[in-house]
Amino acid sequence: MSDVYAVDFALDLKASVPSSVLADLRWHLGIEAVGESGAQDPDGEMGDVVPLLAARGPAARIGGVMVGEFARKAGGWSLTARQEVHAELLPELDSLAERLAWNSSTEGVIGHIRFYEEDVPDLLINRSGTLVKTALAPAGTTTA
């Protein structure tokens, strides 16, 4: 058994996003050599942190393809990413998702995360710059 999660992001970032956040995001996407902390080893890793959105090609557990695209647009930036993330990296993923929500111009759903053996994801929602995780209930179940 593997502790892998499917993670998807689809959101826009404000034009005012700080350059340090852009650099960190580019590092996570594998398109910039140094992230926010500025220090890295020869493998492109920064201490115990690894790029979370840099994998490309067929996914090992979640099916489909892992992608990460980041593009300039009028009024800011657009990000789309789909990745497999190991459970031990979830704290770093939460930190990245919080920074994305804080700098996002997209209100509402900005992504979702799902344990690869589960059918139903948790939504990642931006509420005025605050990341809110909402668990969905599978069809036919009731919540209290």
PLM region descriptions:
Residues 1-36:
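Short, extreme N-terminal segment that most often corresponds to the first beta-strand
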Residues 13-17, 21, 41-45, 85:
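Non-membrane alpha-helical secondary structure
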Residues 25-55:
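Small/polar-rich, solvent-exposed N-terminal microdomains that initiate assembly or binding
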Residues 10, 35-38, 137-144:
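Short, surface-exposed, charge-dense and proline/glycine-enriched linear segments
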Residues 44-144:
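Charged interaction segments
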